[in-house]
Amino acid sequence: MSLKRCRALPVVAIVALVASGVIMFIWSQQRRLIYFPSAGPVPSASSVLPAGRDVVVETQDGMRLGGWYFPHTSGGSGPAVLVCNGNAGDRSMRAELAVALHGLGLSVLLFDYRGYGGNPGRPSEQGLAADARAAQEWLSGQSDVDPARIAYFGESLGAAVAVGLAVQRPPAALVLRSPFTSLAEVGAVHYPWLPLRRLLLDHYPSIERIASVHAPVLVIAGGSDDIVPATLSERLVAAAAEPKRYVVVPGVGHNDPELLDGRVMLDAIRRFLTETAVLGQ
């Protein structure tokens, strides 16, 4: 063995050791890198809309989750939307969205997952799925809500939560804002050197589930989204069954106001829901 090769071996070993250490750290801390909850406190629902109510959604595993409920104002049982948030913050960051959706004539349930907004527990794929099921049950049980006219709205990671819920409990319509195909694929956009498919504890495989959704689907993407590229959203809607719609908001990034309560997005949602049982006559 040459002297040069002898010197190279320790360098290779050090690089391998460092890489292994980085991978082990990421594996052990991955949920801290996926979920970014705000601990609260969260303001009252009535500070957003006068008729808003602070509510508690209880999951099957005993979690008591805080939420906001904004009932529609038309009287009787009517249409509603369940909002599944993205991976960061809490429901207060979606107040403008709640007001905008309520303005379409919908009752709105905006809740926080476990670990978010002062709620107990720690977030995980299984936990968020349980939280969404509990929220859907709560909303369906309200006297002013027609269970046959409930839409789901999912934002980013929440879109994956909404897809999973829609497979189990089909809504009247499914609206997905900035959805990805799977957590591994969106992660690969940002960390292409990591073997994410092997490392991830949570997968959110929406691309494998979307064809099993038996409801009209609207996908909305930002044309300049550098967190969840529109190409991933486009692939997801391509895998969905008809009827489906795909809307790109040009020049808009993942967290821009246009994807919170922007006119293009809201007009697309209004037109779409009017074609479904949610707002259709």
Curated annotation (Swiss-Prot):
Segments crossing the lipid bilayer: 8-28, 97-117, 147-167, 210-230
Subcellular location: Cell membrane
BP term (GO), one: symbiont-mediated perturbation of host innate immune response
InterPro entries referenced in this protein's UniProt entry, alphabetically: AB_hydrolase_fold (IPR029058), Hydrolase_4 (IPR022742)
Keywords tagged on the record: Cell membrane, Membrane, Transmembrane, Transmembrane helix
Cellular-component GO terms for this entry: peptidoglycan-based cell wall; plasma membrane
Keyword Oxidoreductase on entry: no
Membrane-topology annotation of the record: Multi-pass membrane protein
Keyword Transmembrane helix: yes
Stated family: To S.pombe bem46 and yeast YNL320w.
Protein name: Uncharacterized protein Rv2307c
Protein source organism: Mycobacterium tuberculosis (strain ATCC 25618 / H37Rv)
Lineage start: Bacteria, Bacillati, Actinomycetota, Actinomycetes, Mycobacteriales
